[in-house]
Amino acid sequence: MEFKIMSTTDKIEQKVIEMVAEKLNKDKAIITTDSRFIEDLKADSLDTVELMMAIEVEYGIDIPDDEATKIKTVSDVIKYIKERQS
């Protein structure tokens, strides 16, 4: 029997993808770390604000508006969370 130990990055990635899928009403299977919120996932500005707020609550971090505007992809979110947790 083989067990896969998930790294912190893997756990964050999995959770962020779940949150994006839920907030944007999308199938998790279509969301990758390269997915762009507006262009690929058809999110509007309210969707992205709500997503950033949910991430702030989930991870206990603050995402200032000037930083939030730089977050365009799922991988941007993961990178931001990891930077704030270290």
From Swiss-Prot:
O-(pantetheine 4'-phosphoryl)serine: modified positions: S45
Pathway this chain belongs to: Lipid metabolism; fatty acid biosynthesis
UniProt KW keywords: Cytoplasm, Fatty acid biosynthesis, Fatty acid metabolism, Lipid biosynthesis, Lipid metabolism, Phosphopantetheine, Phosphoprotein
Molecular function terms, GO-annotated: acyl binding; acyl carrier activity
GO biological process, alphabetically ordered: lipid A biosynthetic process
Pfam families in the record: PP-binding
Post-translational modification: 4'-phosphopantetheine is transferred from CoA to a specific serine of apo-ACP by AcpS. This modification is essential for activity because fatty acids are bound in thioester linkage to the sulfhydryl of the prosthetic group.
A single Gene Ontology CC term: membrane
Cell compartment(s), UniProt: Cytoplasm
Domain of life: Bacteria
Domain Carrier: residue ranges: 10-85
Coiled-coil intervals, chain numbering: none
Functional description taken from the UniProt entry: Carrier of the growing fatty acid chain in fatty acid biosynthesis.
HAMAP family the record matches: Acyl_carrier
UniProt record similarity statement: Belongs to the acyl carrier protein (ACP) family.
Protein name as it appears in the record: Acyl carrier protein
